[in-house]
């Protein structure tokens, strides 16, 4: 059976290659150059539209570990990136032109790959095994058909993500666990502010430097009204945040005293409260509720560390606001990247809610591998959650209910180690060793390349 792959970006290119390498014919559909997205400039496959870097090369870094896993899994994209790497001070960066040309040439030369330059405007019929890898700028006709297939509430068309911090970096001598009015469990971490702290925080927001929207994103600026950036709330008035995401009502730290004592309550209650909500099953990652923002990343760190309890916060993702088509993956996808309602349809890349080049490649590898397995009548696979690639796919398919937001590779996604290791470098090295050992049954490379070994 011929497998269809829609989109020849990082994920689609990898998916098509894995299908072909499994000995099955695959049709790779790419609308460029007949129709270009606002962000693309060439008709080559796997075009890198933002940075030319795949992230840190060292395998004791999250991005580097994911790259090494992909090397071991026989990734075409990572192999091509390695061959066209440029000096980048410990990161895997590439010569964009040579890299994309080589990737395109490899796929074009494969005898089992048929390339069709056309726009796919509808999802194929249910009997067709398909990998959907159309990326964050999916064309409107296909996006509309995807909306109809998933339900509008399950397909987002503007990404407004709040920052995420590591739970262990939150100062719980200042912050406290509680839910508003003590309803349910103490599901939130709360960072209280007095009036002076709140006003200083607001002033920092008002003066912080914002990221510039791209031209094609400015047309979508009206979408912000439904999820206003925190700096816009600050601009709307001194108390706007306090009556919005920073409202303190119903939140009390038991260390402050007896909440039923009116005098204690008046003396101790917070002027404003920043809430953090659990992002993963194990409570190791926490997002700042209502803190979608368009501030530059360096400014975010500076301003958000003014929040009491977050003075030393370690950020695994900064807030972003940009156009980004992505699925409500926990409701729609299995860890195999198959759609729950149509197992012959798989998704890969940024459209699934992963962030970063290497994460897109990992999704392409798994979706392509499983498309080939389904076509042969074999059961699909999912990678161990102890690997970075597996942790990402398990996260997007199993994230807690609520507002799902894209996630980059990070060690906070991995299950805890059997024994706690306080030194971060040694801990990340242990995560790496476990991940690569657990990946061994799926991989073909015998050992870690010297270039990706941890710097000692």
Swiss-Prot record:
Alphabetized HAMAP family for the sequence: TrmFO
Location(s), subcellular: Cytoplasm
Alphabetized SUPFAM superfamilies for the sequence: FAD/NAD(P)-binding domain
Similarity comment: family membership: Belongs to the MnmG family. TrmFO subfamily.
Keywords from the named record: Cytoplasm, FAD, Flavoprotein, Methyltransferase, NAD, NADP, Transferase, tRNA processing
Organism: Synechococcus sp. (strain RCC307)
UniProt: FAD binding residues: 7-12
GO molecular function annotation: flavin adenine dinucleotide binding; tRNA (uracil(54)-C5)-methyltransferase activity, 5,10-methylenetetrahydrofolate-dependent
One Gene Ontology cellular component: cytosol
Function: Catalyzes the folate-dependent formation of 5-methyl-uridine at position 54 (M-5-U54) in all tRNAs.
Known catalytic reactions: uridine(54) in tRNA + (6R)-5,10-methylene-5,6,7,8-tetrahydrofolate + NADH + H(+) = 5-methyluridine(54) in tRNA + (6S)-5,6,7,8-tetrahydrofolate + NAD(+); uridine(54) in tRNA + (6R)-5,10-methylene-5,6,7,8-tetrahydrofolate + NADPH + H(+) = 5-methyluridine(54) in tRNA + (6S)-5,6,7,8-tetrahydrofolate + NADP(+)
Protein name as annotated: Methylenetetrahydrofolate--tRNA-(uracil-5-)-methyltransferase TrmFO
Pfam families (UniProt xref): GIDA
Primary subcellular site in the record, as a coarse category: cytoplasm
